[in-house]
Amino acid sequence: MSEADGLRQRRPLRPQVVTDDDGQAPEAKDGSSFSGRVFRVTFLMLAVSLTVPLLGAMMLLESPIDPQPLSFKEPPLLLGVLHPNTKLRQAERLFENQLVGPESIAHIGDVMFTGTADGRVVKLENGEIETIARFGSGPCKTRDDEPVCGRPLGIRAGPNGTLFVADAYKGLFEVNPWKREVKLLLSSETPIEGKNMSFVNDLTVTQDGRKIYFTDSSSKWQRRDYLLLVMEGTDDGRLLEYDTVTREVKVLLDQLRFPNGVQLSPAEDFVLVAETTMARIRRVYVSGLMKGGADLFVENMPGFPDNIRPSSSGGYWVGMSTIRPNPGFSMLDFLSERPWIKRMIFKLFSQETVMKFVPRYSLVLELSDSGAFRRSLHDPDGLVATYISEVHEHDGHLYLGSFRSPFLCRLSLQAV
């Protein structure tokens, strides 16, 4: 055989595949499977350790609220006069970090007055803050101190150079800001038709100063628990009338869900009352042929109304600290028909924690004298104006009160 024939008969060596049951590859596979099982078991144990206490808490803890299912219409579309804008961002902040919670505002001449979260009624003049009244006693550092400290909310200028003030915990007062004199008109400890007043809120006064119309937002919840009142949907609020001469008190309308801001009409024939939980404003007739009657002034509002104040155009300003976005998702509308979720939320979280999830969308509405939407001013992210409670018009400006911000805002009407 030649050398060439030998080369033709040789075949290339093929690599051998060795399969050895005792080899290293299977050991690595078994190790990986073991690690995976350890991870899964650890994850499962961690999940169980977290879930069981959570479920136990949900089962054993009592919810502070007993919410009732509520039904809302689809919110109005934010179009036309409701179209979002940033006009509120043109406002300037006043007395920033010098006061907290200037809920309501009144002027006597060019001197401004408001109430603060630490229980004071203060005068704001020439950039200075001066305390003129206090209805409770200190210390007044936290929300839990409010029942002792008092919390001035609605404030109005009377016809004789005095102020009428509604304190959430103490009742109705008349204050002479020049002499620092305080007169208790109606104590919140006075039962009205068998019910306590737990949350005196806003007030409006006739031009002669004789009658005061005011809201008691709840006979169950206090102001410091306002979020529980909203979420529970309690219908124990009332609109009342106080006669400063006879000292008589009448219930004008009851079974209201968080009655809040109030405003007399220019003719003093009806009173508007914001029913915050229901996103609407009711009208109650207090004189004339329709006296004693009531109807809806505005329903299905784009937000939850707080105080109502007159506008120079003959209509009304309404402050709102949050809205019902459409298009968009309204958490409060969603929760309204799901009381079981509300119970669960407040079993696990405090009011302050829940408030952090409430959108900081500030909205101001101007209504016509018939309740039509005339214009709207927005701050979609609450960058300048936050937690708006009231819109007070004075001398070509809007003063924006707030129930929790450490400032108030001033906005020129010429800018909007």
Curated annotation (Swiss-Prot):
Cellular localisation: Membrane
Tissue occurrence: Liver, glomerular and tubular structures of the kidney, endothelial cells, arterial wall and pancreatic islets of Langerhans (at protein level). Found ubiquitously in adult as well as in embryonic tissues. In adult tissue, the highest expression is found in the liver, placenta and heart. Found on the cell surface of monocytes. In embryonic tissue, the highest expression levels is found in the liver and the kidney.
Annotated S-S bridges: none
Positions of modified residues (N-acetylserine): S2
Stretches of the chain found on the membrane's Extracellular side: 62-416
Keywords: Acetylation, Glycoprotein, Membrane, Phosphoprotein, Signal-anchor, Transmembrane, Transmembrane helix
A GO CC term attached to the entry: membrane
Highest taxon, organism lineage: Eukaryota
GO molecular function, one term: arylesterase activity
Residue numbers carrying Phosphothreonine: T19
Region Disordered: start-end pairs: 1-32
Entry membrane topology: Single-pass type II membrane protein
Family, as annotated: Belongs to the strictosidine synthase family.
Protein task: Exhibits strong arylesterase activity with beta-naphthyl acetate and phenyl acetate. May play a role in adipocyte differentiation.
Name the record gives this protein: Adipocyte plasma membrane-associated protein
Species of provenance: Homo sapiens
Lineage of the species this protein comes from: Eukaryota, Metazoa, Chordata, Craniata, Vertebrata
Gene: APMAP
